[in-house]
Amino acid sequence: MAWSASQYAKFEDERTRPARDLLAQVPLQHLRRAIDLGCGPGNSTELIIERYGADGVSGLDSDANMLEAARKRLPGTAFVEADLGSWQPTEPADLLFANAVFQWLPDHLDIFERLMDGLSEGGVLAVQMPDNLGEPSHLAMEETAHGGPWKAAFEEKGVRRQPLAPPSSYYSRLIAKAARVDIWHTIYNHPMADAAAIVEWVKGTGLMPYLARAGEKHREAFLADYLERIEKTYPKMSDGRVLLRFPRIFIVAVKG
């Protein structure tokens, strides 16, 4: 599945806010080495550099289009193409930062444990993941997938990502290797111009695997069906806008 940096950037301010909120809870005054895991177009990497300076900060992602955008944004920063499912730092890092990436990896609990081993003493693993599979925006994806002439493509194997584990699972797995683990949820309510804007948002992330599976032949009809469902489930506010409710989970583990 190929990502689109330009589609992602349409709502960059809203997508960057959780990264900013996550970084604000990282209890490091200084660092020698920080890696932005799943750096995307470099918006979260830029936040790390703004706080700690550029020395020792790098990013990695598995998507060439995202990496190209990141390198244009931060030409003096090293960005590497890598698979987070198997990647491990070659030397201890003070900060491993992951904004909205690990929800795509079903075995991320195992990966978190491995990443803790790649931290320096007192180092931090900081993770944010969307926790929105129960929201109307994502329920409508499944309804559309199984309700149109493209439904045969979804019958044998679905594309819905796995639900996140409960906070207790993250805590139990991480505290064995950490001095402190903080876990919290934040629910963002993003004012969107209309239902079509919600569709544009998810076209850059959660809706992508559905569109890919439906195929180019059905793309426009799939989007029209999905938009109709979104219009029914997101009522207009007094100013004509709609509110996109967006829960996210945050995890900060300090190695000790």
Swiss-Prot record:
Keywords: Cytoplasm, Methyltransferase, S-adenosyl-L-methionine, Transferase. Pfam families: Methyltransf_25. InterPro entries: Methyltransf_25, SAM-dependent_MTases_sf, Trans-aconitate_MeTrfase, Trans_acon_MeTrfase_C. Gene3D superfamilies: S-adenosyl-L-methionine-dependent methyltransferases, Vaccinia Virus protein VP39. One of its GO terms (biological process) is methylation. Catalyzes the S-adenosylmethionine monomethyl esterification of trans-aconitate. This is Trans-aconitate 2-methyltransferase.
